[in-house]
Swiss-Prot record:
Gene, per the UniProt record: MET7
UniProt name for this protein: Folylpolyglutamate synthase
Cofactors named for this entry: a monovalent cation
Cofactor note: A monovalent cation.
Binding positions (ATP): G130, K131, G132, S133, R382, D396
EC nos: 6.3.2.17
């Protein structure tokens, strides 16, 4: 950029984010009913918005183009920052009960009603562990029936390397061109329409839904425009109040293994979490879940199914899959694959592609196309093995106790006979990182001992910058810059490991990778786990190295 030239789009984006922060932190905006009672406050903000509209700030991206990069920049401006998240948590208000009403309103403003989404023949999947893998398995199975279902949509979160991964057609992320095209169609429709401030007082002109809500809207728009015949939707968080729950008539619903996660939003107990997950159940849409759910959670799921006038069936691991090499590694994936078989069976039968549904029995016969779909499933960052030069990388994102135990057990079983050096690369910036490390350590010990342990941030590059698609505003920037979490992890590791491993701290993923390459001349097995932002950032670093 030339010296003295103003970067107006970035300045405007920064202003809009700070304005949003003021609104969210203001007591009246936190409670819409109070906003309604203060006409002066309403007038002030509407007038401010009018002035900025005159300055062509309503949509600054119109001035600089509508590329994929512009779309990602605009999308990142919709993230809630760390201060806002902490402020909301301090109020103790777990639920945004307006979410679904808002989603209906945002949908109206981009030209759709919820009933329009029924034509997508949706599989709706929730759960704590494995819902993304189950969604990928289901999509891959359906993809084997291309003649009858030429276009299959898949909506998942989070992404690893590129936000486009969240919106896939036939297993592949949509292109940069299509992402930008559909993104700005939604963005511009929202800019050109308004909502009633009496019904939606916080939807001031020019405002947008949050990051995940916007992407959910974008996914519906994309799949309808691309004429997808069936779509698989993974819930973002929970189910009852998740933005994907605007889906009124799914064909079938699935629930993967339940566990404790997102407690601020969903509750502290399995019962509360199960209640939220069961919120996706709909009348007339059968629901399936994996075997060996926590008993208390299963009881609540059954109650929710009865309440919603549908059935809930437990799916046993199919014996026919015992010797099948699934596209996603890990013994625990057999349960997810079995659930995917039942979900796909329901869609294919409803679409008159399968004459008979697959029986929900461990001895059931599974069609060859289903097996091929499970074998061909690709899902980066989950039990992934990569050979890079002399080293072998074992990569599996894990951010809950159960997923960390599963990931660590997978790594232990994969390398227990290996004589190579063992290196751990870990970060988890926003959850109880030390507790996860303790779960990891107890899962691999005493069979596996690490020679070196590296704790890094999720910052992508040595320069201190992030890959654009990996920008995250929901963690404390001060903690990242001061390496507070990483230093705490070092102390904890040295304590539980009795100072046997060499511990290291790096300020970026790129630095961590360079450190690993210089630690030993001999080959090493490297376990990368924790945050999916770490996993995605590492894969981005690998991509740049491969290009060079």
């Amino acid at each position: 950029m030339h010296k003295g030239k103003k970067n107006y789009p970035n300045l405007i984006t920064s202003f809009r984010m700070n304005l949003k922060k003021i609104i969210l932190n203001h007591d009246r905006f936190s409670h819409p009913e109070r906003w309604k009672t203060n006409a002066l406050l309403r007038f002030t903000f509407v007038y401010i918005k009018f002035l900025f509209d005159l300055m062509i700030i309503k949509n600054p991206l119109r001035m600089v183009g509508k590329t994929n990069r512009d779309a990602v920049t605009a999308l990142n401006s919709l993230q809630s920052n760390y201060a806002n998240i902490m402020a909301i948590r301090q109020t103790g208000d777990r639920k945004n009960t307006m979410t679904l009403l808002e989603m209906h309103e945002w949908s109206r403003r981009i030209g759709y009603s919820a009933s329009d989404f029924n034509k997508l023949n949706i599989v709706h999947i929730t759960g704590t562990k494995g819902k993304g893998s189950t969604a990928a398995f289901t999509s891959s199975i359906l993809g084997q029936y291309k003649e009858q279902l030429p276009r299959i949509g898949l909506y998942t979160s989070p992404h690893l390397k590129s936000v486009r991964e969240r919106i896939r057609i036939n297993g592949e992320p949509i292109s940069e061109e299509k992402f930008a095209k559909y993104f700005f169609e939604v963005w511009d429709r929202l800019d050109s329409t308004t909502s009633s401030l009496d019904k939606f007082p916080h939807m001031i002109p020019g405002s947008k839904p949050g990051y995940f809500k916007f992407l959910t809207l974008l996914s519906f728009h994309t799949f309808i425009q691309e004429d997808c015949k069936s779509c698989v939707y993974e819930v973002g968080v929970g189910g009852e109040l998740d933005s994907t729950n605007i889906i009124e008539k799914p064909i079938v619903c699935g629930v993967t293994l339940l566990g404790i996660d997102h407690t601020f939003m969903l509750g502290d107990t399995i019962e509360e979490i199960a209640w939220n997950k069961g919120g996706i159940f709909k009348s007339g849409a059968p629901a399936f879940t994996v075997e060996k759910q926590p008993p208390q959670g299963l009881t609540i799921l059954k109650e929710r199914a009865e309440e919603r006038k549908t059935t809930l069936t437990e799916v046993p691991p199919f014996k026919q899959l015992e010797n099948v090499k699934l596209g996603i590694a890990g013994e625990f994936q057999k349960s997810n694959a079995s659930l995917a078989v039942m979900l796909a069976s329901e869609i294919l039968h409803t679409s008159n592609i399968l004459e008979e549904k697959i029986k929900c029995s461990s001895n059931a016969s599974i069609p060859e196309k289903f097996i091929i779909g499970l074998q061909n499933t690709k899902w980066e960052g989950r039990c992934q093995v990569l050979e890079k030069g002399k080293n072998v990388w074992y990569i599996d994102g894990a951010h809950t106790k159960d997923s960390m135990v599963a990931a660590s057990t997978w790594f232990r079983d994969m390398v227990r006979l290996s004589k190579r050096k063992k290196i751990l690369l870990f970060n988890q910036q926003s959850r109880d990182a030390n507790a996860l490390v303790n779960n990891l350590y107890s899962s691999v010990s005493p069979e596996i001992t690490f020679d070196d342990v590296i704790f890094t941030t999720n910052v992508t590059w040595k320069s201190g910058s992030y890959s654009a698609d990996l920008v995250s505003m929901n963690t404390s920037q001060e903690d990242v810059e001061k390496l507070k979490v990483q230093e705490s992890l070092v102390k904890n590791w040295n304590k539980i490991d009795d100072n046997r491993a060499k511990t290291h701290v790096t300020a970026s993923i790129e630095e961590a990778n360079e450190l690993i390459e210089t630690l030993y001349d001999e080959p090493a097995d490297i376990f990368v786990t924790g945050s999916l932002h770490l996993v995605g950032g590492l894969l981005v670093v690998f991509d740049r190295i491969d290009v060079k």
